[in-house]
Structure formats: C-alpha cells, structure tokens
UniProtKB/Swiss-Prot annotation:
Keywords: Membrane, NAD, NADP, Plastoquinone, Quinone, Thylakoid, Translocase, Transport. One of its GO terms (biological process) is photosynthesis, light reaction. It comes from Nostoc sp. (strain PCC 7120 / SAG 25.82 / UTEX 2576). This is NAD(P)H-quinone oxidoreductase subunit H. It is found in: Cellular thylakoid membrane. The lineage of its organism: Bacteria, Bacillati, Cyanobacteriota, Cyanophyceae, Nostocales. InterPro entries: NADH_Q_OxRdtase_suD (IPR001135), NADH_UbQ_OxRdtase_49kDa_CS (IPR014029), NDH1_su_D/H (IPR022885), NiFe-Hase_large (IPR029014).
Length: 394
C-alpha cells in the first residue's frame, strides 16, 4: 500500500507561563515536529523579586521573614540555611534541644514538600484522586506548624540565629507522634493506589532517563541525583544539625527515570517519619536558643559609662555585626542542595548573599531530557523534576 509522505514545518508552541502543569510561572518554548519534541527553551524570571539584593540591605534577623518566599512549598529549609550561614561564620553554637526541634520541623517540611510534589505530578500524569488525598495530610502538618510557630504554610519565621523563636507548646509532641502513626499507613495506601497501576507505570517508566554521569555533570542534587544511582545526601555528608544522632538510610535508585524519582521521594517520606519519631523520643531538655549569642561581633569595647557602651541582651541583637570572612552553608531540602554563599564585612548587613537553589540547577537539564520525546511526556518529565518558580527566580 502506497504511503503519502507528508513533511511539515516545525511548530513552535508556547507552554506557560500560565499553563496549569508549569508549576508556577515557567514558560517553555517547545519546537515540535508533529508529536516529537525537537527543542525546548525554558524562559524563567517571571517571579524574580531581587531576594539576594534585599538580603544585602537587611540584617539577618530582619531578613528571616522574607525567605519563605523562595521555595514557598518548603519555607523551613530556607529559614534553616538563612540562620546556618551566620552561625557558621560567627561560630554561634546551637543548643541540643533547639537542634532537635529544627530537625523535627525540617522533616515535617520534607514530607509536606513531597506531598505537594506527589499530588500535582500525578495530576499531570492523569491520576486525579491522589491530588485531593495529599491535601488532607498536609493540612495536619500545617496544624502542627500553626501550633508551634503561629503560621501555616509560609512565613513561619521560626528559626533564629542560635536556636528557634519559641519552645514547643504543651501537647505538641503527642500530636506530632499521632500524625506519624497515622501517616505511615497512608503512604502504603498511596503506594497501593498508584505505584503498581499499569497505566501509571507505562506513563513514567523509562521516561526522562538520566545516567549517573549526566546527573553529576549537570550538577543535580536531591532526589534527582539519588534516583540516578548517586548515594549523596547532605544530611549524611555534612553532618549538620543533629542528624548523626538518628538511625536512618539514604534512599536511592539506579534507573534514573521518572519512576525512580517517584520511588525515591515516596521512600524519603517514610525515612522522615522515622527521623521525627527518634527526635521526639530523644528530645533533650534545656534552652531552645543560645542565650550567650549576644552579638556576632561586639564591636568597640568601651567603658560602662561611655556614650557608645553596647548593652548585652540575652538574645541575638537585631543590630549584630557579621564578622569579616566568607562561608558556604547548605542544607538538604526536599528538592536538593539549598546553599547560601555569605561574605561578611564586619557590618550589620552582609556584603554578599548568594542563594544556590536546588531546583534552578535541576531545571537546567530539562531541554536535554525533552529532545526526542513526545509532547505528552513534557509535563511528566517537568513534573518529576519538582520545580518551584519562587526558588528558581528568587
């Protein structure tokens, strides 16, 4: 049977910045040859708010409320790295109780982050049910945050240089344990609903494969890196906070496709529950903030009756000075390595505040993954990367 050959010009398609599966204001200029993706150019910057410049015109205490807006699905990680950098630069110690409370909050945030990835990713694939289920569990996490910090999703403003803003309220620990006991069977329910569904597996298995070498060369981090066979987790590598006190495993896969990234994130939620339970069981007493962290640099030492005498308060002063020096601090957020490069100049303001977001680096590999794929795979591969545009654009 004779076939009629049809040759068409490549079609340029704009996806976003208001497409529901763009996960924010991301615009993709996709060049298509029929159903095949020839090229893809991400256009970013629609959510740029000058967060680095704002940081350089604020003290650390003033800047903490701003940082939840980078990755607004996981604001606690932003706060953690914002206070970790000045702490490392000035050598401010964090009390054991404060460190345990931080770990509990960060792991709750990791679960909330993965849930907010899980629902929309499955909605992109075509499974609507889990999208509504995950809101139920995230609501419980937000209730815990509201009780401890006074706020729910973003702008918790809970982390402080040298500790946390307030101790855990009475009864909070019991509520958190109740959530942990409730949540583990829920993950099993999700897995039963989704993981072995033949339609779901055909949709994501073998799609968007990243080799081990590619993952390292592109500078990927977090689940994107661990799904490609690299067992790298900053909680184990950098030994920050008190993660060494707990028994938990780094979750990783070798396939490097969308299914591997899904599997890593689902397992990480179980590990987070394991860490939270251990942290609550071993929660030490003592202060929740460093009462000796009076100022990062006391400035001029003067006589007690002199005009410029600096009174020493119990908490970190809003006008403390950053010591001269530079530091790179990083934490393992739900999306990967979130880092701050900080240069202090013996001033109340940092001289340079460089944010290294995980999803900005992870997003770079998207055009490489999309070339040669079908147009239906675009939203699947993008969804598996887990990007939040507030963090990408800053």
């Amino acid at each position: 049977m004779a076939r009629i050959e049809t040759r068409t010009e490549p079609m340029v398609l704009n996806m976003g910045p208001h497409h529901p599966s763009m996960h924010g204001v991301l615009r993709l200029i996709v060049t298509l040859d029929g159903e095949d993706v020839v090229d893809c150019e991400p256009v970013i910057g629609y959510l740029h708010r000058g967060m680095e410049k704002i940081a350089e015109n604020r003290t650390t205490v003033m800047y903490v409320p701003y940082v939840s807006r980078w990755d607004y699905a996981a604001g606690m990680f932003n706060e953690a790295v914002t206070v970790n950098a000045p702490e490392k630069l000035a050598g401010v110690a964090v009390p054991k109780r404060a460190s345990y409370i931080r770990v509990i909050m960060l792991e709750l945030n990791r679960i909330a982050n993965h849930l907010l990835w899980f629902g929309p990713f499955l909605a992109d694939v075509g499974a609507q049910t889990p999208f509504f289920y995950q809101f139920r569990e995230r609501e419980m996490i937000y209730d815990l945050w509201e009780a401890a910090t006074g706020y729910r999703m973003v702008n918790n403003n809970y982390f402080r240089v040298g500790g946390v803003a307030a101790d855990l309220p009475y009864g909070w620990v019991d509520k958190c344990l109740e959530f942990c006991d409730y949540f583990l069977p829920v993950i099993d329910e999700y897995e039963k609903l989704v993981t072995n569904n033949p339609i779901f597996r055909r949709r994501i298995e073998g799609i968007g494969t990243i080799s081990r070498e590619e993952a390292i060369n592109w500078g990927l981090s977090g689940p994107m890196l661990r799904a490609s066979g690299v067992k790298w987790d900053l909680r184990k590598v950098d030994h920050y906070e008190c993660y060494d006190d707990f028994d938990w495993d780094v979750q990783w896969e070798t396939a490097g496709d969308c299914l591997a990234r899904y599997t890593v994130r689902m397992r990480e939620m179980r590990e987070s529950v394991k860490i939270i339970k251990q942290a609550i069981k071993g929660l030490p007493g003592g202060p929740y903030e460093n009462l000796e962290a009076k100022r990062l640099a006391a400035g001029k030492k003067s006589e007690w009756d002199a005009f410029d005498y600096q009174y020493i308060g119990k908490k970190v002063s809003p006008t403390f000075k950053m010591p001269k020096g530079e530091i790179y601090a990083r934490v393992e957020s739900g999306k990967g390595e979130l880092g701050i490069y900080l240069i202090g100049d013996d001033n109340v303001f940092p001289w340079r505040w460089k944010i290294r977001p995980a999803d900005f680096n992870n997003l770079q590999i998207l055009p490489h993954l999309l070339r040669g794929m079908k147009v239906a795979d675009v939203v699947v591969i993008l969804g598996s990367i887990d990007v939040i545009m507030g963090s990408v654009d800053r």
